[in-house]
């Protein structure tokens, strides 16, 4: 099983790893796209006012421009440790034992806007760029990434993909049709039986799910296998629309 996660806007600063290496991350075929987007971000950062406008930064966020300017030289840390926010706080990868972290490294990709999907343990620098940003110097991010990411995922050829990304990041790299995939929607059930999508708790539930998977390290190779594991783990999951699963929180 391969799990696809969205990134987070908030990130830990610093790191102790070597600087960014476009071809040293998971899916190395994406190195040209990674380099193009990173170079465009660095070029944009030469004009702080323009960068703040494009990245929609407020006065207290302008330090993010300098973060982007240093992308090629900045220290790195594992992607799963770099990101903070609701999903990654619930996952709390730093507190996992080594075997669970290795499981994350083997089974989880985090889909970023500047680097595309990267392995959970891949070293990445801090950055500021969202999926919907129109970045000068390169085509729309969807044009940069979608076809290339789909091809790279196809080359990896996982037996089953559990897609926990937001729809904005799905658009930057749809899973190829030939790969069995389930897109997960987090929902709740009201007392009247109505099922409603969740927002804030959506992220928490996804992070907690991945932590549970990393703790137990199951061998899952199909949607049916995932549903069986979830049922045994006391989680409520059901097939909904074609290609989708509902996770009840």
Which functions belong to the PLM regions below?
Residues 52-126:
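A glycine-rich, hydrophobic loop/mini-helix early in the fold
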Residues 93-249:
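Internal, well-folded beta-alpha domain core
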């Amino acid at each position: 099983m391969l799990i696809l996660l969205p990134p987070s806007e908030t990130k830990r600063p610093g790191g102790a790893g070597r600087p960014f290496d476009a071809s040293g991350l998971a899916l190395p075929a994406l190195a040209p796209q990674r380099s193009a987007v990173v170079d465009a971000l660095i070029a944009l950062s030469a004009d702080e006012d323009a960068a703040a406008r494009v990245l929609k930064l407020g006065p207290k966020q302008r330090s993010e421009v300098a973060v982007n300017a240093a992308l090629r030289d900045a220290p790195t840390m594992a992607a799963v440790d770099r990101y903070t926010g609701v999903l990654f706080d619930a996952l709390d990868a730093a507190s996992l034992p080594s075997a669970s972290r290795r499981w994350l490294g083997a089974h989880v990709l985090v889909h970023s806007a500047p680097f595309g999907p990267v392995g959970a343990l891949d070293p990445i620098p801090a950055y500021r760029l969202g999926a919907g940003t129109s970045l000068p110097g390169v085509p729309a991010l969807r044009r940069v990434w979608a076809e290339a990411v789909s091809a790279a995922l196809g080359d990896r050829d996982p037996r089953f993909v559990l897609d926990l990304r937001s729809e904005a990041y799905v658009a930057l790299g749809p899973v190829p049709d030939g790969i069995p995939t389930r897109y997960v929607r987090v929902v709740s059930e009201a007392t009247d039986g109505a099922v409603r999508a969740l927002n804030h708790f959506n992220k928490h539930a996804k992070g907690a799910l991945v932590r549970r998977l990393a703790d137990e390290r199951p061998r899952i190779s199909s949607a049916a296998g995932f549903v069986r594991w979830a049922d045994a783990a006391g989680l409520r999951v059901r097939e909904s629309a074609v290609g989708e699963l509902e996770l009840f929180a």
